[in-house]
Design a protein with these regions (language model features):
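Early transmembrane hairpin of solute transport permeases
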Residues: 44, 54-70
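Small-residue-rich packing faces within the transmembrane alpha-helices of Major Facilitator Superfamily
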Residues: 61-64, 114, 118-121, 186-190
């Protein structure tokens, strides 16, 4: 009912809004970490993994779309790199979203997601401290993108920390790497968000709206 909808904008909604704001600050500073940051706080608050990941990816449909447009406008996108990442990343994210929403027991994998989030935190911190790196040829981009998309959907985040950090670690140009990975992330987030809604329904609208507004 309308009264129930209005009642949903309570203190809990404010918490989700603040999580969205903080996650966006982290992502804006490092060029990655929105999903990992927001999912970590949502899980700590007691939100189930499937609802957390659904909320994050639906919110990312908006945030990554805006980011992709911005990077395109400033000429930060390597179209060849985007092509290599796009389809494998989308397929991996669809597979991960389907498993989490319709196959895997969310409570059973909570400990594994917690460990995964700690790993992502280490990756993000390392990326922030990286100095000049000798460029090396990056092989098997399709496998990297598939793995990044899959783990992003199951864990609620990780596309940036996994894909961007790996590419930067091989000495790729930061400007084009971050721009291209962020552009591909829009399709990855859109695919997983739609998959979550198809197989799990629209759950936790407070989480979704709070993160989007944040």
């Amino acid at each position: 009912s309308w009264d129930g909808f209005i009642a949903g904008f309570n203190q809990e909604f404010l918490i989700f809004f603040c999580i969205g704001v903080f996650a966006q600050l982290v992502d804006g500073t490092l060029g990655m970490g929105y999903g990992a940051t927001s999912t970590s706080f949502l899980l700590a608050y007691g939100i189930p993994p499937a609802i957390s990941s659904t909320g994050v990816h639906v919110a990312e449909m908006f945030t990554t779309g805006a980011s992709a447009i911005s990077h395109h406008r400033f000429g930060n996108i390597n179209k060849k790199l985007v092509r290599h990442l796009l389809i494998p990343g989308v397929l991996g994210s669809i597979a991960g979203a389907y498993l989490l929403s319709d196959v895997i027991d969310g409570d059973a994998i909570k400990p594994f997601i917690a460990v995964y989030m700690i790993g992502l935190a280490v990756i993000i911190i390392r990326k922030a401290m990286q100095k000049n790196i000798i460029k090396k040829k990056t092989k098997r981009l399709n496998i990297l993108a598939s793995f990044g998309g899959f783990m992003d959907a199951v864990g609620g985040g990780g596309w940036g920390p996994i894909v961007t950090s790996t590419l930067l670690g091989r000495g790729r140009n930061p400007r084009y790497t971050i721009g291209s990975v962020n552009a591909a992330e829009f399709a990855v987030a859109f695919a997983s968000g739609v998959t979550f809604m198809l197989f799990g329904g629209i759950q936790g609208w407070q989480v979704i709206i709070g993160l989007i507004l944040g």
